[in-house]
């Protein structure tokens, strides 16, 4: 790392640590640094208590309405699971062991448990530790009950044969094909945002009272009221009691610890925690400390309730915490530093929870123990005013001074964002830990209005998950969408419905021998056929998924925090909730790979005739071994990411295929099933099944990620990448959604005030072009290579992956190499 001309602040801190120097920010963050060091280098452990008590309750309630069963299971968990208060902590509440931990959701994919438990400690992607006793409990007490009852098994049996063969590689559906990949069986719901403000202003006792009033108002003679509404409302009452009980158990523990504590400062801290946990989240928060604790209890209990995507978002934290912060600051109850310490106590709590995927597919899609509790800052108020405040800047300061990979900070940008805000965003990006990612109001808000939201609702969106956005109390869609490997669709054109990875198995449409195609139009039409087949497969999956989910999942706590669920007495997993907006999606994987491949075929085979189709296919089959001249020729074709209309027009045509298909068939599903370009880390396992491609990519290597250019193809600078993203979008069509865009700068590129100003201008350009998302790595390639050689020295190196940041050494070698291969821009 010392060979680099310029280090980012994050790299410099790592270098200082290697040299034995004390972090210069430690003195002002001593508490959270101490907590972090207690767990940071440990392998996550599996905690089985949630699964054990959930299973015990579900055994005892078979035959009852599902929302009631779920609420009773949550009460059983709240009564029995171990509660912890960590040393030095000021915020309490966790869903499992002390240290880094993950929990199990056997109702989801418990059919994997019997075989997966012994493999988890040794798998390449995100391994977990488990004690022998916990492994025994899983295999002997938990897994047997769920055999034949899991959501994954139901989905596997429900898929038609033609859909199944593109989805799974075995009859039981235990292994993915990585072609048209369902994602609903390794998460109960997609990413979500609760209405935390409701908890802070009302408390769960008020929500319980609302449910009791609705029960009292039911028509005792109405079949609907008795069979549908009453069980839902009774579940709300139970779950409110459950989270209140769980919080009071923490209050009791804090009081017990305080009674034994000899250090007077820590004793008072524990007494304060006991008082706070006895009050919230049952009652409205009165102070900033109470607000932070109430929010954290809500978020952790939501994790206990179900597996929500990769996590439940924190929403617009600088907005709903602001009144408490402003009041306490004015009354002298807190200082900026003490408020920051409370928030960072929450941050280290987030870092200890680790998302656990039992299935190999889930683990491969979410490497680096991925979960991203997005904290949204900035943007606009529901009235359309700029929303930045002092808390906004405090969150940015925290990211620069305490570079933890949680929370996932997301900065909303709009055309009137203040210069100071953009400057501090730029300074935080320059720090080099990958924060914040940027989301553009100028794209998101009009798009959501076009889909039925009011301006106030759209303006109040919060970032959720990788790059997605949600509107609390208006969004109602929870089903995971398909990840579609369109590079596989291209390969099926080249091999007439087959893929080299899968031998003679017929997977796609028989579009004919491409060597017999005389024109580009013939080849394009063959690609369209395969593309549409993949989309049809995804939409059939989604239709089945939508109809299955309410039979397998309920979400009483999440429903209690949604206005429409409470109004209509419907669980959040109900397929159609009146007045709700169903924002679904499918993911396009390998966009840059496919665009550049089609560009090369069109230009070199059909227009310039520098290559025959036969010569191309021969070079692809041998993975360019001995055909390096052809590989270089293919790489010389026009490429996406360079503001080149030849390639970008193909990209726009491909995007239109997906958007138009979604527009035509989404109404049949009762939803907006929109195209997104958000791969998480799936572009790596998807690449492992795709042979060499006509853009010069070698077989089995990673595909391009999101809406980014193929690695090494973007040679005209970062602004050209923004322009290509703009060129490739069909702005006149609303059936589109998130696009993830990764850009890597060297620290030298953004050095000093001049570098900050260039970055601010770059952000303004991103905003003006109405792109959805962009995120940055500011790092030297040499640092990444050094971390590969000596991972222990670089244990704390944080990098930006796919809508989230993670420790570089927690990634598989394939994903590490993918990050290294991304173009690092020296000039802007």
UniProtKB/Swiss-Prot annotation:
Q: Does the keyword Transferase apply?
A: yes
Q: Which GO terms describe its biological process?
A: alkanesulfonate catabolic process
Which InterPro entries does the annotation name? Form_AcTrfase_GR_CS, Gly_radical, GRE, PFL_dom
Reaction(s) catalysed (UniProt annotation): 2-hydroxyethane-1-sulfonate = acetaldehyde + sulfite + H(+)
CDD domains from the xrefs?
A: PFL2_DhaB_BssA
UniProt-listed PANTHER family: DEHYDRATASE YBIW-RELATED, FORMATE ACETYLTRANSFERASE 3-RELATED
- Under the GO molecular function aspect, what terms does this record hold? lyase activity; transferase activity
Residues bearing PTM Glycine radical: 803
Q: What is the lineage of its organism?
A: Bacteria, Pseudomonadati, Thermodesulfobacteriota, Desulfovibrionia, Desulfovibrionales
What is the protein name stated in its UniProt record?
Answer: Isethionate sulfite-lyase
List ligand-binding residues for 2-hydroxyethane-1-sulfonate.
Answer: 187, 191, 466-468, 676
Its biological purpose is as follows: Involved in an anaerobic respiration pathway that converts the sulfonate isethionate (2-hydroxyethanesulfonate) to ammonia, acetate and sulfide. Catalyzes the radical-mediated C-S bond cleavage of isethionate (2-hydroxyethanesulfonate) to form sulfite and acetaldehyde. Shows no activity with taurine or ethanolamine as substrates.
* GO terms for cellular component: cytosol
Q: Where is the PFL domain?
A: 30-698
Question: What does the record say about PTM?
Answer: Requires the activating protein IseH to generate the key active site glycyl radical on Gly-803 that is involved in catalysis.
Q: Which UniProt keywords apply?
A: Lyase, Organic radical, Pyruvate, Transferase
Q: Where is the active site?
A: 466 (cysteine radical intermediate), 468 (proton acceptor)
């Amino acid at each position: 790392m010392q060979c680099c001309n310029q280090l980012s602040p994050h790299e410099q801190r790592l270098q200082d640590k290697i040299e034995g120097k004390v972090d210069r920010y430690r003195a002002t963050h001593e508490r959270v640094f101490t907590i972090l060091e207690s767990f940071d280098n440990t392998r996550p452990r599996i905690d089985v208590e949630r699964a054990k008590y959930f299973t015990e309750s579900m055994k005892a309630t078979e035959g009852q309405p599902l929302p009631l069963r779920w609420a009773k299971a949550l009460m059983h968990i709240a009564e029995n699971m171990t509660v912890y208060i960590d040393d030095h902590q000021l915020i309490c509440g966790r869903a499992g062991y002390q240290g880094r931990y993950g929990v199990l959701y056997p109702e989801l994919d418990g059919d994997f448990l019997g075989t997966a438990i012994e493999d988890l400690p040794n798998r390449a992607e995100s391994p977990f530790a488990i004690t022998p006793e916990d492994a025994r409990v899983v295999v002997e007490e938990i897994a047997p009950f769920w055999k034949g009852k899991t959501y994954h098994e139901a989905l596997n049996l429900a898929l038609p044969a033609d859909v199944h063969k593109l989805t799974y590689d075995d009859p039981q559906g235990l292994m993915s094909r990585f072609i048209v990949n369902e994602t609903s069986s390794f998460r109960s719901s997609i990413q979500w945002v609760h209405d935390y403000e409701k908890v802070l202003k009302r408390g769960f006792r008020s929500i319980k009272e609302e449910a009791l009033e609705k029960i009292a108002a039911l028509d005792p003679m109405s079949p609907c009221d008795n069979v549908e509404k009453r069980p839902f409302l009774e579940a709300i009452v139970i779950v409110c009691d459950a989270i209140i009980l769980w919080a009071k158990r923490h209050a009791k523990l804090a009081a017990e610890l305080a009674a034994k504590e000899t250090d007077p400062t820590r004793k008072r801290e524990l007494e304060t925690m006991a008082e706070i946990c006895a009050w919230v989240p049952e009652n409205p928060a009165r102070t900033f400390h109470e607000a932070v604790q109430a929010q954290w209890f809500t978020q952790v209990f939501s994790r206990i309730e179900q597996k929500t995507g990769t996590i439940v978002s924190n929403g617009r934290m600088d907005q709903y915490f602001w009144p408490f912060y402003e009041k306490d600051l004015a009354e002298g109850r807190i200082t900026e530093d003490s408020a920051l310490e409370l928030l960072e106590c929450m941050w280290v709590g987030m870092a200890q929870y680790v998302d656990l995927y039992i299935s190999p597919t889930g683990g491969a899609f979410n490497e680096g123990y991925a979960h991203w509790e997005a904290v949204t800052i900035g943007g606009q108020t529901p009235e359309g005013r700029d929303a930045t405040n002092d808390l906004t800047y405090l969150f940015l300061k925290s990211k620069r001074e305490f570079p933890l990979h949680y929370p996932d900070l997301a900065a909303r940008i709009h055309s009137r964002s203040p210069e100071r805000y953009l400057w501090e965003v730029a300074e935080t990006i320059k720090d080099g830990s990958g924060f914040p990612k940027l989301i553009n109001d100028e794209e998101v808000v009009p798009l959501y209005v076009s889909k039925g939201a009011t301006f106030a609702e759209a303006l109040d969106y919060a970032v959720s998950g990788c790059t997605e956005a949600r509107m609390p109390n208006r969004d109602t869609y929870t089903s995971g969408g398909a990840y579609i490997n369109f590079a596989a669709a291209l390969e099926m054109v080249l091999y007439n419905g087959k893929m080299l990875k899968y031998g003679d198995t017929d997977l796609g449409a028989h579009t004919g021998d491409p060597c017999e195609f005389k024109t580009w139009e013939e080849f394009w039409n063959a690609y369209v056929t395969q593309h549409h087949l993949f989309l049809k497969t995804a939409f059939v999956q989604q239709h089945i998924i939508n109809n299955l989910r309410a039979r397998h999942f309920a979400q009483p706590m999440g429903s209690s925090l949604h206005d429409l669920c409470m109004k209509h007495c419907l669980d959040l997993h109900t397929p159609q909730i009146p007045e709700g907006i169903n924002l679904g999606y499918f993911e396009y994987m390998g966009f840059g790979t496919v665009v550049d491949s089609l560009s090369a075929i069109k230009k070199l085979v059909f227009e310039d005739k520098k290559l025959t189709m036969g010569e191309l296919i021969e070079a692809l089959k041998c993975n360019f071994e001995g055909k390096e001249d052809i590989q270089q020729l293919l790489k010389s074709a026009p490429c996406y990411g360079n503001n080149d209309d030849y390639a970008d027009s193909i990209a726009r045509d491909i995007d239109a295929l997906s958007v138009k298909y979604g527009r035509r068939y989404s109404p049949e599903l009762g939803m907006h099933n929109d195209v997104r370009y958000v791969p998480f880390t799936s572009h790596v396992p998807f690449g492992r099944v795709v042979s060499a491609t006509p853009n010069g990519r070698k077989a089995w290597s990673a595909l391009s990620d999101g809406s980014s250019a193929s690695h090494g193809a973007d040679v005209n600078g970062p602004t050209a990448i923004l322009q290509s993203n703009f060129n490739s979008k069909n702005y006149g069509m609303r059936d589109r959604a998130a696009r993830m865009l990764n850009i890597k700068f060297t620290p030298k590129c953004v050095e000093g005030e001049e570098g900050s100003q260039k970055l601010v201008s770059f952000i303004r350009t991103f905003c003006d072009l109405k792109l959805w998302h962009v995120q940055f790595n500011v790092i030297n390639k040499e640092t990444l290579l050094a971390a590969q050689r000596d991972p222990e020295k670089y244990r704390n190196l944080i990098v930006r992956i796919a809508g989230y940041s993670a420790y570089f050494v927690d990634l598989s070698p394939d994903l590490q190499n993918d990050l290294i291969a991304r173009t690092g821009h020296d000039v802007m």
